[in-house]
């Protein structure tokens, strides 16, 4: 695998420069939003996951498949559409897909597949998911309302506002559980990669890590409203709602660990794959050419966007002279 490192480094640097706006925007969200602070841990986690597979990768050599670079054309088209409509998340996801394509083109099918889990984990670098916040608010509000009905607590719901005799609660965007959901899914994917070897078990556990935090957030919101009813004051119950949230998140993570632990698969019996040692190792020129092919075809999208912007600017009417 070591011969591929220079080509990957050059390719990643070139793509980083090409998509620098996406990188800057992503890091800005990591810093400003608590829902995405965990993104700073993604690259160290990926590095550890690759290191954890060192026994399987013994003797692994890259066999580039340069022709897969053609997939950069439709991905670039997706990036272009996202750029035209102003969806930064779409641009970032397309850019990350190009990065995945770079790894595939340089490493080859077998080596890429051996590293598929860690490499796909790189998608957590993209701060996506904000678009589901209204849906999460709907789910949390409905869960809380039905829970109050079951508990016999009088309530009136208008959109995301829940009124009880003791006061009013509002299911704000921050209360929808997005940050808990994203963090739980990131943890669930990491746990699945470390504890399971079969893709079936990994997929099941990841699905569980999506469902459990959504339900848990509903219980959290219901608990806060019910506590306000018991205390006789909505303000008193909502005072420490952030603390309650982190306690619930800790419980969710513990619950996921407990649910997944009995089904873990032993990782100690992993052996190095047969890497066809008799095949010739690809030259540095071949590896760099594969990376260059991905870069050149991916560059068509940003280049087209720049040309469109220049043409649009040229069509704008000139400002009248100042008097």
Regions found by a protein language model. Give the residues of each.
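Hydrophobic N-terminal alpha-helices or hydrophobic patches in metabolic proteins across all domains
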Residues: 1-323
